[in-house]
């Protein structure tokens, strides 16, 4: 098998837009299913964050490796294989870790946001009207499925949406994503609400409330969310609007 094959190795994971294959030698291939003009940017972000991690800042991210020109399809990223389970998988096996994992997610996100965004990193208009010199690195998709739990500690994956901006926006978007994920079953729905509330307390309610409306708008602008998630975000957006008018107390 070669990197140009449709199936370059055993399939390890599948997301909404990409698949991850084991290509041996401690490496994996992340392949987008369609031509993706953000691959170069995502690779640059990951390399930047990996260098920050090696310098003692930020969080552990997979190391990215060069592709040969002949293998570069515009859809692929070759990176270090991370052995472990996602935080979500760990929660499914050990639900009693809910509160400690929510606190860990908040701590990991702070470590991401402690890194100052370089000038070349984009800033979404939903996060801020203009770019600032002291903007933080924002992951903008940091939830339990994008944190790998390993023997060496948490590793953050999937940097597709990474940007620069105010740290509170990243925190609010994580809260909105977790709070509005589409899941079946009353126990799963209750678990999500508990996790979202615990994350909000650990990350800072005031910071999240300040950016909650913008985070909802950012999420609603994402064409990839499911109809159920769109309905959930819309309902949360209405709650935020009511809360801002002062007619009710903050919602967890």
Task: Place the predicted regions along the sequence by residue.
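Conserved structural core of kinase catalytic domains
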Residues: 65-107, 128-129
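Helix-rich C-terminal or lid/interface subdomains of diverse kinases
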Residues: 84, 104, 173-252
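Active-site acidic catalytic loop and adjacent metal/ATP-binding pocket
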Residues: 19-22, 120-121, 126-169
């Amino acid at each position: 098998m070669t990197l140009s094959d449709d199936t370059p190795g055993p399939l390890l994971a599948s997301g909404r837009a990409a698949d991850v294959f084991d290509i041996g030698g401690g490496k994996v291939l992340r392949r987008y299913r369609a031509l993706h003009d953000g691959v170069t940017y995502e690779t640059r972000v990951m390399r930047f964050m990996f260098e920050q991690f090696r310098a003692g800042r930020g969080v552990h991210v997979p190391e990215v490796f060069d592709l040969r020109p002949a293998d570069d399809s515009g859809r692929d990223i070759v990176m270090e294989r991370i052995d472990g389970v996602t935080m979500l998988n760990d929660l499914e096996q050990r639900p009693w870790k809910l509160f400690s994992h929510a606190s860990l997610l908040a701590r990991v996100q702070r470590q991401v946001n402690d890194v100052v965004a370089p000038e070349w990193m984009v800033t979404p208009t939903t996060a801020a009207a203009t770019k600032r010199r002291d903007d933080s690195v924002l992951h903008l998709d940091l939830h339990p499925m994008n944190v790998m739990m390993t023997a060496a500690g948490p590793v953050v994956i999937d940097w597709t949406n990474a940007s620069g901006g105010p740290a509170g926006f990243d925190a609010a978007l994580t809260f909105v994503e977790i709070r509005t994920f589409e899941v079946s079953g009353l126990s799963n729905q209750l678990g999500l609400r508990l996790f979202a509330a615990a994350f909000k307390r650990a990350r800072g309610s005031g910071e999240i409330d300040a950016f909650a409306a913008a985070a909802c708008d950012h999420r609603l602008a994402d064409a990839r969310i499911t109809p159920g998630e769109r309905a959930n975000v819309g309902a949360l957006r209405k709650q935020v609007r009511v809360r801002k008018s002062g007619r009710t107390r903050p919602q967890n």
